A protein has these predicted regions:
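Active-site-proximal or metal-binding-adjacent scaffold patches in catalytic folds
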Residues: 1-60, 69-103
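Walker B catalytic acidic pair
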Residues: 65
Length: 103
C-alpha cells in the first residue's frame, strides 16, 4: 500500500497545482460509504480502497474533493466546475456509482 499511497499523494499535489486548488492535509482512511471527503478546513480524506480503482476514477475522486476546497456543496456551480475540469463529471460519477459500490 505504501507505493500506491505515495503515488496518490503525488497525484493530489499534481492535480491541485495544475488546477490551482489549495488543501490543508491529506489522509487515507477506511470509509464504508464514501470514496473521499473534504472538511471545512480543506483537509482531504481519501478512502484507502481508492488504490483498487482505475486511474481515471482515482483522478475523478481527487478532483471532486479538490473542487470541494472551493465549493462546499453539490450545487450547479460545483458540478459546473468539476465538469469543466473532467470533461464529463456526471458521466464519470455515474460510472463510479454503478460499477464500484461501497458497502
Amino acid at each position: 500500500f505504501i507505493h500506491e499511497e505515495e503515488y496518490l499523494i503525488n497525484r493530489v499535489e499534481t492535480l491541485a497545482k495544475k488546477y490551482g486548488f489549495e488543501y490543508n492535509k491529506l489522509k487515507f482512511k477506511v470509509m464504508k460509504t464514501r470514496w473521499g471527503s473534504c472538511t471545512a478546513k480543506n483537509n482531504i480524506n481519501l478512502n484507502m480502497l481508492i488504490i483498487y480503482l482505475p486511474k481515471r476514477l482515482q483522478d475523478y475522486i481527487i478532483l471532486h474533493e479538490l473542487v470541494h476546497t472551493r465549493i462546499k456543496d453539490h450545487s450547479h456551480r460545483f458540478w459546473g466546475l468539476l465538469g469543466k475540469i473532467t470533461g464529463d463529471a456526471k458521466g464519470i460519477h455515474k460510472d463510479l456509482k454503478e460499477k464500484y459500490i461501497l458497502i
